[in-house]
Swiss-Prot record:
UniProt keyword list: Coiled coil
GO CC annotation, single: Golgi cisterna membrane
Superkingdom, taxonomy of origin: Eukaryota
Entry similarity comment: Belongs to the GOLGA6 family.
Name used for this protein in its record: Golgin subfamily A member 8O
Keyword Cytoplasm: no
InterPro entries named in the record: GM130_C, GOLGA_cons_dom, Golgin_A
Coiled-coil region(s): 85-150, 209-421
Organism field: Homo sapiens (Human)
Start-end of Gly residues biased regions: 508-520
Length: 632
């Protein structure tokens, strides 16, 4: 009975052990391994200590030594087998942990590489944005420079047209002045002849003067036609200049269109690159999300081969994705390099354009200097035109007064001739014959009648008024000449004192022909200054020769000069020879070589009154020589 109870107890204990092992499988191997490593105890004792039922102490099972030792020996063999299995599984688990750690390290390295690539992409994007901003600023600067160039060209054309108009007006005014001087000289010569030959005045002489006036009118009409033709030629030249400027504008528009097309292509390429970068960023974000997903918890049991294969496939997939990303990054880097090369080429083009624009700015600045001088000259030309208008008005007044005086003199002469003819009618034919013989005398004897005396006094009063007006005209002409003398000296000094001293070198070397290609507009201005100085010196030489001839011939009285007895009263109030502007178109005045020039006697008088003008004379109009040369 005792043996049967023992066997029953052993069977119950085995069942309980099996149930216990089935319930606590993952805990038992770990405890066994720990007991092995730390204490070095036998697994049997551990199992027996861990598997002892709670009721054995009460039943007295542990008191029976031989029976319990036998059962423990029987249980030792499966426990050892299970310990070996647990050792193999622990080795596999450690290997898997090592692989997981290596994968984590690879993951960290890949994330680090991705972060570096992202930083590089961000830096590239920043550089591209900066380049876009620079390109936009350069485009804006280019547009501003183009507008400035357009306005400067318009202002230059406007100033050139104004200068042409002023030059034409000055020439026309000078021609009118010469014509008025010739007309005045002709009128004064006729008045002298009338004063010298009161008896020889007749209807034939007046008709001859009318014919001459008609001829003068015909000449004036011919001159007007010539002026109209020259005006038409100037208009044609202006049209040609306008066509040339339109051609240049078309070229500039073509260049701007090409630049705009290139900028559009660059913008399209940049948009494509931005799209690619966004796609890459999306792929990177997806990968980060995949990497950031929580790992599944560690399996409580040993992972199977299926799970290992799944892990290997995932690793291969991740490696393939990384390789594809590396290839994409390489492709993006190549595209970025190409874009950088294109941007560099565009920067070089922009630099070249900036250099060209800077050169144009320098040229415009150099042109602005003579423009300021040219504006001053325009203002001075306006003032001279005003002075000339005043001179014209005075001359017109003189002409009207001369005509009125001539008509009055004709009436007085007819009255005197009628009075002179009355006493000769009562003495018969002998007196008529004597009058016929004495008719060709140059000067008849002036009767001492009161009417003739009144006529002579009125004539002398008219001469006094004429002398006063001529003195006013001469004063204004002297002011005009002195003013132009000072301004011409200042302008020549300004041209000679330009930066670089090129004007002086050009003046010594022969104008703008030796200024060279490097001089540019400065060489042209220097050549203009040299030409102006040469013209100035030639004018001085000719003027000195003219003054010398005038001094030599001033002492010799001309054949058409009035007698001193008749013009004694006029000499008291002013020399008539100083007032009159003798013309080469009237009678005996053509014999004197100095009287061929309408302004001979006033120049002699100016030289006598102002001796400084002969040594340092100036040209009344300082023409700019560089304006026509710039067209060439």
């Amino acid at each position: 009975m005792a043996e049967e109870t023992q066997h029953n107890k052993l069977a119950a204990a085995k069942k309980k052990l099996k149930e216990y092992w089935q319930k606590n499988r993952p805990r038992v191997p770990a405890g066994v391994n720990r007991n092995r490593k730390t204490n070095g105890s036998i697994p049997e004792t551990a199992t027996s200590g861990g598997c002892q039922p709670p009721g054995d102490s009460a039943t007295g099972f542990h008191r029976e030594g031989p029976t319990s030792s036998a059962t423990l020996k029987d249980l030792e063999s499966p426990c050892q087998e299970r310990a070996v299995v647990l050792d193999s599984t622990s080795v596999k688990i450690s290997r898997l942990k090592n692989t997981i750690k290596s994968l984590k390290q690879q993951k960290k390295q890949v994330e680090h590489q991705l972060e570096e690539e992202k930083k590089a992409n961000n830096e590239r994007q920043k550089a591209e944005r900066e380049l876009e901003v620079q390109i936009q600023t350069l485009i804006i600067q280019k547009e501003e420079l183009n507008t400035d160039l357009y306005h400067m060209e318009r202002s230059l054309r406007y100033f050139e047209e104004e200068s042409k108009d002023l030059a034409v007006r000055l020439q026309h005014s000078l021609q009118c002045k010469g014509e008025l001087e010739s007309a005045l000289s002709a009128v004064i010569a006729t008045e002298k002849k009338k004063a010298n030959q009161l008896s020889s005045c007749s209807k034939a002489h007046t008709e001859w003067e009318l014919e001459q006036s008609l001829q003068d009118q015909a000449l004036l009409k011919a001159q007007l036609t010539q002026l109209k033709e020259s005006f038409q030629q100037l208009q044609l030249e202006r049209d040609e200049c306008a066509e040339h400027i339109e051609g240049e504008r078309a070229r500039w528009h073509q260049r701007m269109s090409k630049m705009s097309q290139e900028i559009c292509t660059l913008k399209k390429e940049k948009q494509q690159d931005m799209r690619r970068v966004e796609e890459l960023e999306r792929s990177l974000s997806k990968l980060k999300n995949q990497m950031a997903e929580p790992l599944p918890p560690e399996p409580p049991a040993v992972p199977s081969e299926v799970e290992l294969q799944h892990l290997r496939k995932e690793l291969e997939r991740v490696a393939g994705e990384l390789q594809s990303q590396v290839k994409n990054n390489q492709h993006i880097s190549l595209l970025n390099r190409r874009q950088e090369e294109r941007i560099r080429e565009q920067e070089e083009r922009l630099r070249k354009q900036e250099e060209r624009l800077q050169e144009q700015h320098e040229k415009l600045r150099q042109l602005a200097k003579p423009q300021s001088v040219f504006e001053e000259l325009n203002n001075e030309n306006k003032s001279t035109l005003q002075l000339e208008q005043q001179v014209k008005e005075l001359q017109e007044k003189l002409g009207e007064e001369h005509l009125e005086a001539a008509s009055q003199q004709n009436q007085q002469l007819t009255a005197q001739l009628s009075l002179m003819a009355l006493p000769g009618e009562g003495h018969g034919g002998e007196h008529l014959d004597s009058e016929g013989e004495e008719a060709p005398r140059p000067m008849p004897s002036v009767p001492e009648d009161p009417e003739s005396r009144e006529a002579m006094s009125s004539f002398m009063d008219h001469l006094k008024e004429k002398a006063d007006l001529s003195e006013l005209v001469k004063k204004q002409e002297l002011r005009f000449i002195q003013y132009w003398q000072e301004r011409c000296h200042q302008k020549i000094h300004h041209l000679l004192s330009e930066p670089g001293g090129r004007a002086k070198d050009a003046a010594l070397g022969g104008g703008h022909h030796q200024a060279g290609a490097q001089g540019g507009d400065e060489g042209e201005a220097a050549g203009a200054a040299a030409d102006g100085i040469a013209a100035y010196s030639n004018y001085n030489n000719g003027h000195r020769k003219f003054l010398a001839a005038a001094h030599n011939s001033a002492d010799e009285p001309g054949p058409g000069a009035p007698a001193p007895q008749e013009l004694g009263a006029a000499d008291k109030h002013g020399d008539l020879r100083e007032v009159t502007l003798t013309s080469s178109a009237q009678g005996e005045a053509r014999e004197d070589p100095l009287l061929d020039k309408p302004t001979a006697q006033p120049i002699v008088q100016d030289h006598q009154e102002h001796p400084g003008l002969g040594s340092n004379c100036c040209v009344p109009l300082f023409c700019w020589a560089w304006l026509p040369r710039r067209r060439r």
